[in-house]
Amino acid sequence: MKKIILIASLFISFITLGQKKQTIDTVYIRTSALCGDCKERIESALNFQKGVKYAELNLETKIATCVYKPSKVSLNELRLSLVRVGYDADDMKADPEAVKLLPKCCQPGGH
């Protein structure tokens, strides 16, 4: 009986030690958003990324808050997801072709 308890204890210990603790980070990305449509596009682009737990854009500050797992997605990948849908992301400029596809109200000078 003692052997069974010892083996079970060792087994549980190995399982517990084998699990990685995943870190979660929060990042704030400055965007070129202009309106509610921009907000929806930016939040969708970020939330679609694997590893993103939560993303929200504050239209007043044009700052996107993103909670994500760095082991699944990098900060650069998050920025690129915004660039690809037509928005600036910090110092990265929006893809000009993607900007052309945005509604007029979402393009620079649209409001």
Sequence positions of predicted segments:
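Conserved short beta-strand edge segments in small beta-sheet-based binding/regulatory domains
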Residues: 86-98
